[in-house]
């Protein structure tokens, strides 16, 4: 503590400096809070995710309307919206004249000033591109109603254009506008899997100015694989093969899948059940490429099932002996008995299975797995992405008195918290999530060991009965591949998913996490909201928002929308309903046609100031430290 005081004294070495900083902090605390965007279940759909950020989930169009009113035509508003959202595309369209720049840049500066109105000058300065910060500030705060200032403004603008700096200048201003409109981003899990663009999503998050992440079940298998869990890695790669983006992942992360590909090509033949699900991307694949993915998909699936059988045997404390594994198959009759009913097997690809020891890897499989793991853990880009997940991520987040988590808080059928009994201890509610997070961080410390308890527990997070990220009694992947009877495919959801409609239970969960404010809410992802069937994203008497992004094209037929995101500004919450995203060019051509539908959920009685937020708590703590300094050293 004494050392900290010495550091503080070095920075604030006079009474006036302390007073100035206290005044600055008080000014910031009394400004309105910034706008937060909550988004979930991106599932590798980079372009749709990128559009939500570029359009600021519809806020951009609203700000343009509010800023310019009737002074701009609808066509001009369209063009301005497209420019701020996708400046790179708009600036490439045709040759822009000097007059176009002289008309457009002042509009951008007006919009920037409008977006910055509720922030301090310091906040605006931090949002500006450093190379243009001084000049943009000068232009933003110039009163062009005064003749001298108008001339000053026009001269600076002309000089920027003459220096051929107009394009990077516009790019910088557009980025600053978007940054001011979304002050903080919450990603409520499942960045990975289904779509090919997870690496691009992670790259964008790496450079986002302020964010937090709540881990999802599909994120956890990538983390587990990187930390040494072969079972997690095989799940991640199998899903990539199933949805046809394995080669995209291989290229993006520099993975070496050659040993796997050669082994699969030698061992397997065509099997329609393992044909990749490509959707509209099927036209991009040749018949040979599809066959190759079929073979690789089979290889990854069988290896995954072998590794999972080994893990379940290794971890009796997981209490998963009732799960269907390769050991329970009758290979002579090719059938599987579940609940005393015998089921014939279909789509089988058991070439490498020894019926006397089904979970043992063949030498070629073992070599392929070792090669994949070395490649997985050796990828610099993947390491960068996993580091971001660890630095910004957690099992849950309490932010501004709201509770964010991806999956569920396991509950008994009675509505009580469901305990995980393990190693002579039991964990429920908040302690259950803390238990999993502790072991995930332990596994990250030593990725050379892949079969320790902490690393195995990451795999349990993926599919364990009491995993807050999974939320079902079992995962029936093996049954779905090899048994026709759909009764065997059923996965029963945890009681949480029915109880989350109860205001009483939602209040109980909030209080479990120390949240007793009437303004506190929960934000949850994981399960698509089936709007077409009358489901609402608002649950529990308004205490819970379910915001599965629905960006994944495969879900949109079920949901009837491209999902939801949530906005929270100083006036309250707004629920945003997204329409299916086509492509960036369509947005450039008709940005207001893509406008997201907003629903104001609740307005606060008084505008929320920074002093009432999580950041405000940090700033007020700094104030207390400075007051203590003032009293102790400057005779205040």
Swiss-Prot record:
Q: Which GO molecular function, any one, fits this protein according to its record?
A: fructose 1,6-bisphosphate 1-phosphatase activity
The UniProt keywords, alphabetically, are: Carbohydrate metabolism, Hydrolase, Manganese
Instruction: Provide the E.C. number(s) assigned to this enzyme.
Output: 3.1.3.11
Cofactors demanded by this protein: Mn(2+)
The record's disulfide annotation reads none
- Which reaction is this enzyme known to catalyze? beta-D-fructose 1,6-bisphosphate + H2O = beta-D-fructose 6-phosphate + phosphate
Query: What enzyme category does the UniProt record give?
Result: hydrolase
Superkingdom as given in the UniProt entry: Bacteria
Q: In which pathway does it act?
A: Carbohydrate biosynthesis; gluconeogenesis
The record's family statement is: Belongs to the FBPase class 3 family.
Protein name, as recorded: Fructose-1,6-bisphosphatase class 3
Write the gene name.
Answer: fbp
């Amino acid at each position: 503590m004494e050392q900290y005081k010495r550091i503080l004294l070095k920075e604030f070495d006079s009474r006036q400096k302390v007073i100035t900083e206290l005044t600055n902090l008080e000014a910031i605390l009394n400004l309105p809070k910034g706008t937060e965007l909550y988004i979930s279940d991106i599932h590798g759909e980079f372009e749709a995710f990128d559009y939500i950020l570029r359009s600021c989930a519809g806020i951009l169009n609203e700000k343009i309307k509010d800023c310019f009113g009737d002074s701009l035509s609808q066509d001009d508003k369209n063009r301005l919206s497209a420019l701020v959202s996708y400046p790179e595309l708009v600036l490439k369209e045709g040759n822009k004249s000097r007059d176009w720049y002289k008309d457009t840049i002042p509009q951008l500066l007006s919009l920037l000033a409008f977006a910055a109105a509720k922030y301090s000058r310091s906040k605006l300065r931090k949002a500006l591109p450093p190379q243009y910060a001084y000049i943009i500030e000068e232009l933003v705060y110039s009163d062009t109603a005064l003749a001298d200032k108008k001339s000053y403004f026009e001269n600076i603008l002309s000089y920027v254009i003459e220096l051929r700096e107009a394009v990077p200048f516009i790019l910088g201003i557009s980025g600053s506008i978007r940054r001011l409109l979304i002050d903080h981003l919450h990603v409520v899990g499942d960045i990975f899997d289904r779509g090919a663009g997870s690496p691009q999503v992670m790259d964008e998050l790496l450079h986002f100015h302020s964010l937090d992440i709540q881990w999802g079940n599909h994120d956890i298998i990538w983390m587990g694989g990187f930390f040494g869990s072969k079972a997690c890695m095989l799940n991640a790669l199998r899903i990539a093969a199933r949805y046809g983006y394995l080669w995209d992942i291989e290229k993006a992360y520099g993975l070496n899948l050659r040993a796997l590909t050669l082994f699969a090509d030698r061992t397997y033949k065509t099997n329609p059940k393992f044909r990749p699900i490509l959707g509209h991307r099927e036209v991009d694949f040749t018949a040979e490429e599809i066959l190759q993915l079929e073979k690789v998909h089979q290889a990854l699936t069988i290896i995954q099932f072998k590794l999972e059988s080994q893990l379940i045997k290794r971890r009796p404390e997981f209490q998963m002996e009732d799960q269907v594994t390769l050991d329970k198959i009758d290979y002579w009759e090719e059938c599987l008995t579940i609940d005393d009913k015998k089921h014939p097997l279909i789509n089988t690809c058991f070439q490498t299975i020894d019926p006397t020891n089904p979970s043992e890897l063949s030498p070629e499989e073992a070599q392929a797995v070792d090669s994949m793991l070395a490649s997985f853990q050796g990828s610099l880009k993947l390491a960068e992405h996993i580091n971001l997940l660890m630095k910004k991520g957690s099992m849950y987040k309490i932010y501004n008195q709201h509770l964010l988590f991806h999956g569920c808080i396991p509950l008994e059928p009675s509505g009580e918290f469901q305990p995980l009994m393990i190693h002579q201890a039991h964990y429920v509610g908040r302690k259950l999530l803390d238990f999993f997070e502790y072991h995930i961080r332990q596994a990250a410390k030593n990725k050379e060991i892949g079969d320790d308890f902490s690393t195995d527990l990451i795999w349990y997070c993926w599919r364990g009965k009491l995993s807050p990220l999974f939320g079902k009694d079992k995962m029936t992947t093996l049954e779905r591949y090899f048994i026709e009877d759909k009764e065997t495919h059923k996965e029963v959801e945890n009681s949480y998913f029915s109880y989350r409609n109860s205001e009483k239970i939602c209040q109980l969960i909030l209080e479990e996490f120390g949240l007793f404010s009437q303004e506190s809410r929960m934000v949850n992802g994981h399960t698509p909201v089936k709007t077409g069937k009358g489901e609402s994203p608002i649950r529990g008497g308004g205490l819970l928002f379910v915001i599965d992004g629905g960006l994944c094209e495969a879900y949109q037929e079920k949901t009837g929308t491209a999902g939801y995101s949530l906005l929270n500004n100083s006036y309250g919450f707004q629920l945003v309903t997204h329409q299916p995203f086509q492509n960036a060019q369509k947005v450039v051509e008709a940005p207001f046609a893509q406008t997201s539908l907003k629903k104001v959920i609740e307005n606060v009685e008084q505008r929320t100031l920074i002093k009432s937020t999580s950041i405000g708590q940090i700033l007020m703590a700094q104030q207390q430290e400075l007051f203590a300094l003032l009293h102790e050293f400057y005779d205040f």
